């Protein structure tokens, strides 16, 4: 199976300039763009089965939350998620969404592609990202909880907005927080550098699986050593 076969190109034509411009406009305005049904529904079960198998080799990370993480070097050669990440067609499409940007896959043997798997009681606390954008593919939601909560554009390069950030963290400004839809098959491009975000606690015995695909506007990007140890518990072999 080719990576392109996984994608509903009738709904999301990857080479459509008008679509690129529309999605880029949304991303610029909201720091996030959500593409529901990007992955064809008939392939979701297969991707979930792959995720369940991968989870058996995951590392348990408990820094600012609780999550099981599968690193890039743990995805086998036949992995559909790996094939999707390594396909230039998807990378180029994301670059169009970002505004005609040339992208490169991470050179990080651990962080280029991750699977984030969260079980009952797991969560991610409020945080900002260190990168301008993250690409995710939602594969399976939990029975309850597991909401991706986003206080969009709450700070900027010129204003840390510390009082508002503190208020959101303390639950005092729910009016600034929205929940991004993460139904199975959804592709999301998200700028977490300026938007405070979290994942609410998982409830129930169904694992929440999300694939995280790392690209950058320059070649050779790697995660720093501290992040590698805290997220994967090791350095590359």
Show the residue positions of the predicted features.
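Intrinsically disordered terminal extensions flanking catalytic oxygenase cores
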Residues: 1-14, 235-237
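Non-heme Fe(II)/2-oxoglutarate
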Residues: 11-96
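Hydrophobic residues positioned within well-ordered beta-strands of beta-sheet architectures
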Residues: 35, 133-135, 211
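Short strand-connecting beta-turns/loops that link adjacent beta-strands
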Residues: 40, 131, 144, 204-205
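Short beta-strand segments enriched in hydrophobic/aromatic residues
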Residues: 51, 139, 215-217
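A structural signal for well-ordered alpha-helical scaffolds and beta->alpha junctions
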Residues: 87-91, 132, 192
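Catalytic core of non-heme Fe(II) oxygenases with the double-stranded beta-helix
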Residues: 95-100, 104-189
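Catalytic core of Fe(II)/2-oxoglutarate
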Residues: 152, 158-237
